Amino acid sequence: MQTLTKFKVSGKQTLAYTKQERINVGDIEGHILSLIEAKGVNVSTGKIEYMNGGQVVNLVTSDLVNFSGPIQGYSIVKKKEDSAIGKLEGKIITELSSEGTPVAVIEANLTWIKGTGQFKNIQGVVTAKGRYISENIYIVEWEGEYWIEK
């Protein structure tokens, strides 16, 4: 039986909203459903390079109360002929800082589900943590491992 080679990778992404739809649910104050598209760039930070300079598109839905709650969606990274698509699930937690301003942090897990080019048949997992640096811009640091199914 052949053993799969696993690659440990990590990176940092800076993303900005390019589309956003928010709908007030109306049951309790501050309850919204949200759909965003965010675009940005991936910077590889690990020993093994992964999609350094790749273009990132995140498509995320959320069910938030006072900007805290579950998120899910997809993250797509492309660089030339290579791409990797991951399904993500996680949460946004928004709290007030000591200065009284909202601080939103993101925690998510991603499972790679599809790839092209050198990432065709990609499988693997990622953990990610991020923070908003403005209302519509966020930074995510991630690490994980992948392998290519034969």
Residue ranges and their predicted role:
Residues M1-K150:
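Beta-strand-enriched cores of mature, soluble protein domains
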